[in-house]
């Protein structure tokens, strides 16, 4: 089919080439032979009057012209997929839809397990692929490579729609045998102790509390860096180190292993976890259904959490919201905090 001189099938080939960056892989992805894909490249170059790709070994390197086309082509194909091809009514009970979700280990353990359990009852054939943070999660949303991104709202891009899930608090944790935690934690003691901290993404960027401290000119002695909050409690066992993690996750581990929760010596900000999805999924019935499930379960969990803190937590009840913090936007900070 041609539209203003362009064979629309060539857009499918172009998208595969720009996504895979390899001729063989792109041809395999759309079930074309390599000669047919090479012919498609020649026709694309002729139509756009641009080389589009150069070879570096076996890798296809996009020209600036191809880079400029990548987003619009992907969005056009996704719009056709969602608005024209997949316009049938969504039936959760019969669907075998796969949702790809980027989220932290914290949100997987304390929140998304609820989603998995509920979906197993309501839509048993629906599948999930839970992915670790990348350094550019917003770009994955734009390309339609993931369905949802779950992280603190503070670090979300304004380019995609979003909805808040629940607020969370940061607390300090340590081993119950840690004698330095037998009394209220002072800032001097906190600063002198060895810390275990979680960092995220391939670049191991700092998490929220580390960023907060750096913004205020404070620096801790970090002795161990782990790739997720769930690794902090095991590393703290039988040591005099301290860690910082979300309260709900700390309570989860407190019930399963020796862990002591203590109030931070400085007012670490609370933060709001939120969910974000590609703008072109706004009217997708499956995405709408999944968003409703996410928001309902978040509301249920927030209601369950409205209880007095445990005595050992002694959590400060004063409001400490992230949005009240002055943020230096020149600071290199990933959208992959939690």
UniProtKB/Swiss-Prot annotation:
Residues 6-63 form the HTH lysR-type domain. Residues 23-42 bind DNA. It comes from the Bacteria. InterPro entries: LysR-type_TF, LysR_subst-bd, NodD_PBP2, Tscrpt_reg_HTH_LysR, WH-like_DNA-bd_sf, WH_DNA-bd_sf. Keywords: Activator, DNA-binding, Nodulation, Repressor, Transcription, Transcription regulation. Transmembrane segments: none annotated. GO terms for molecular function: DNA binding; DNA-binding transcription factor activity. NodD regulates the expression of the nodABCFE genes which encode other nodulation proteins. NodD is also a negative regulator of its own expression. Binds flavonoids as inducers. Belongs to the LysR transcriptional regulatory family. This is Nodulation protein D. It comes from Bradyrhizobium sp. (strain ANU 289). The gene is nodD.
